[in-house]
Structure formats: structure tokens, C-alpha cells
Amino acid sequence: MAPEPTPVDAASLTYEAVIGLEIHCQLSTQTKIFSSSSTQFGAPPNTNIDPVCLGLPGTLPVLNEKVLEYAVKAGLALNCQIAPYSKFDRKQYFYPDLPKNYQISQYDLPIAHHGYLEIELVDDKGTARRKKIGITRLHMEEDAGKLVHAGSDRLSGSAYSLVDLNRAGVPLVEIVSEPDLRTGQEAAEYAQELRRILRYLGVCDGNMQEGSLRCDVNISVRPVGSNTFGTKVEIKNMNSFSAIQRAIDYEIERQVAALKAGEPIVQETRLWDEATQETRTMRVKEGSSDYRYFPEPDLGPIEVTAEQLAAWRAELPELPAQKRRRYESEWGLPPQDARVLTDERAVAEYFEATVVAGAPPKLAANWIMGDITAYLKEQKLAIEALPLKPAELAELIQLIEAGTISGKIAKEILPELLSQGGSPKALVERKGLSQISDVATLEAMIDEVLAAHPNELEQYRAGKTKLQGFFVGQLMKKSGGRADPKLANQLLAQKLNPGS
């Protein structure tokens, strides 16, 4: 007779999280997926509507071709297989913001599937670690409307609810990851990298505050080394990447604590509460929902020809990860600099144009990440609207490199250049700010400084050599900051130490 298995002490186990994300991305089309109504955000309630998105009798949907193009481009950028043949399906459920009582989505034949996204995690020492996250599928669907609850942020407890159908019929792609993520940091980086890619493509603006990118998290925990999935919990209501990370970190701790205490994990949907920094129960799931999918009879099959696929693939831009690696390998930038510069496509393009115009890459990176970024934040400007053009920034950097002006002078004229643009060289000439590099002129200035401070000169020659910095400061003051620092220090040392 086989011996009884030894009971496992749950409290002594080490656990790991298993995390997958479902991300809904609103496509940046001018009109809705199956009708001609506008997709403009912030319009007065129920003004961007039409008979099709209201589901009125006798109306027929027509697929917006731009939606298909954007979905395929997103699939290609995520290394997915593109289905040459796919279809739409009806997902049946009742909710007040769903006028047809079904949603047109894709079920068993999505437009893209079996892809991956590589994330890059940089530690405190600046070392990058890469991890490949599988993508199960990407499918197209229409959005539902929006409920506004009076007196509460949810249906329960509200006095009444209002329905705004402006969002009904807005085109979405839903991107479902494999459960390859293990931490809140990995999940947040995955979501950020996905948004970067979509924004580079121009297919989604990724604005989480406006709901253009919405993320649901599926999370369970299991003992390290186990291949069995634990009970899955879904988390909603996270409107920033930081919130995604914090919600996951909290939920991992909650589930591990429950298991170690011998308590079961309930399959449920939970909401992230930003005020309390906790997840709370929204609804308990008794089982998987039966949406009774069947093919959408009012829409024909979707075919993507080899010619279409080749044309759309040729239009893909260089993506963020490709840029980061090029900046590191070709231009020697540190990983963190490369990440900052490639976060926004417009910033990366500005940086590259500055380098092409003749600026050393590291110096261009420093100016863009420092003073220019600070100015853009202060003025709430996009870099595309910056008056200072890349070629003008390159000219400013070249003036410093050539010794025409000092870094201090460059900082002084930068505000005017940022607000008005124009040639830095012309501005320097107009203001008479060129660096003084003439030996005779500098020697005369040094003689005047030394003559004006005999006590300090006597102390210096008596051994208080730290006073050289004082004399340098006085010389820079006398020259209005225009003295060539390197040459000035050299000449000053000769004057202070005659005969040495």
C-alpha cells in the first residue's frame, strides 16, 4: 500500500505571479468602425451618433478600411501572423450602453495572432535585461457607449444613470498577451512599450486619461516550480502605468497572504481603488460567460491580400526598440538615454535631425533631455512646436565645440533661442558674445585683475594656491563670461607663477 502523501505547508511555500494583460486600444480614425460618425473625444453627449451605431432597424454596417489597415499594421509591428481570411462575430450580452444588445467583435478568426513583444527592463545600475512576451491575438471590435452614474462612481448606489453613446461604434483593437508576465514592473513596461509602438505607428494616441488605451489585468499566483495555474482574478480601473504596477503588486501580496493563511482565492473581478491603494471586489464570477458568438451576417469576410500586406509592411516606421539598439550601437548612448529619447517618436526624430546636422550624439542627447525637455514641460509644448529647430540646436553645440562661445554663454542665450528660434551664430554676433581667445587681450585683463587684488595675490604667492579659483572668477566677471576658460586658466597660471 502506497504511503499517504505528505501535506504541503502553504505558509512555507514561495509563490510567483502569473500575469496576462488584455489591452483595448482606440484606433485614431476620423470616423467610426462601421459608420461615418466622428470619433472626436469630448463632444457633447449623444452628438456623435447615427442610425448605424444606435442599432436602428434597417441599418447595415460597412467596415472602415482604415480600421483594417491600422489593425494589420499593429499586428505586423507586434510580430504577429496576419490572417489572410478573417471575419466579424456577434458577441451577445445586455447592458444599457450597448444599443444593439450585441457587440460586433472577432471570435475564432482574429485578424492577427501568435506574436510577441520584447520588453527591456533597466536596473538601478543601468544594465538592460530583455524579455519576450507572447501575444495570443489581436482582434478588431466596436466600442460600447458610456454610462454616467449620478451620485456614485458605479451603478450600485447611484440615484440614476445617463447613457452617452458617442463612444458606441468607435474602433478598437484588443491585444491579448500570453501569461508570460511575473511582476508589476514587467506588466507596466509591457503596457508602456505597447503604447510606444502604437504611437510610433500613428494608429492610437494611447491617452489613458481619455480611455484611448484601457488595460485589464488577469493575475493568479502559484508555488514557484509549479506548472498549474492558480485561481484567476481580473483587475480593472487602472488609468496609468504606475497604477497598473501598484495594483498588481498589491494583488500579488493579497493572494499570497490568503494562500499562506489557508484561505481560498475567489474567482472574481476587482477594481483598483486609487484612494486606498487597494483592490476591492466588483463582482464574483461563477463561471465563464457564454456570449453565444456567431458570425456577423451583415458583414462579409475580411481578406488581406499579399499585395496589401506587403504595402502596409513597407510603411512601418523604425520602431522604438530598433531605435534604442541603433542609438546604443552606432552612437554609443547609454541604455537609459536611448530609452528617454525614443519614448516619443517626435523627440527621437528631433534628436536624429540634430545629429545629422552635425552635433555629437551625446551632446545633442544631453541638451534635449535637459534644458529643452524642461522648457517643453514648463511651456506645455510638444517638441514639434518648438521654435528652435534641430539644425539651430546643432549650430549652438558646434559653437561651443569650436570654442566660439562657452557653455555658460550658451545657457544664457538658450531661452531666447527656445522661444524665438533663429541662428545661434547670428545671435552671438549681434550681442557680441563671442568667446575671447586672443592672448594679448586676455593677458591685459589678467594684469588688471591681479593689480586690483594685491592682498589676494600676496596670499597666493605665500602658498594659498586655492585662490586661483578666485582669480578665475574675477577674470570671468571682467570678461562678461566670454574668456576662453581653458586658455584663461593657462595664462593665469603663468602670471601667478612667474618663472615656474
Swiss-Prot record:
Organism: Thermosynechococcus vestitus (strain NIES-2133 / IAM M-273 / BP-1)
NCBIfam families found in the cross-reference section: gatB, PRK05477.1-2, PRK05477.1-4
EC class name: ligase
Key word rRNA-binding present: no
EC number: 6.3.5.-
Pfam families documented for this protein: GatB_N (PF02934), GatB_Yqey (PF02637)
Subunit structure: Heterotrimer of A, B and C subunits.
Entry-linked SMART domains: GatB_Yqey
Family, as annotated: Belongs to the GatB/GatE family. GatB subfamily.
The keyword Signal appears for this protein: no
GO molecular function: asparaginyl-tRNA synthase (glutamine-hydrolyzing) activity; ATP binding; glutaminyl-tRNA synthase (glutamine-hydrolyzing) activity
UniProt name for this protein: Aspartyl/glutamyl-tRNA(Asn/Gln) amidotransferase subunit B
Stated role: Allows the formation of correctly charged Asn-tRNA(Asn) or Gln-tRNA(Gln) through the transamidation of misacylated Asp-tRNA(Asn) or Glu-tRNA(Gln) in organisms which lack either or both of asparaginyl-tRNA or glutaminyl-tRNA synthetases. The reaction takes place in the presence of glutamine and ATP through an activated phospho-Asp-tRNA(Asn) or phospho-Glu-tRNA(Gln).
Keywords carried by this UniProt record: ATP-binding, Ligase, Nucleotide-binding, Protein biosynthesis
Gene3D superfamilies named among the record's database cross-references: 1.10.10.410, GatB domain, N-terminal subdomain
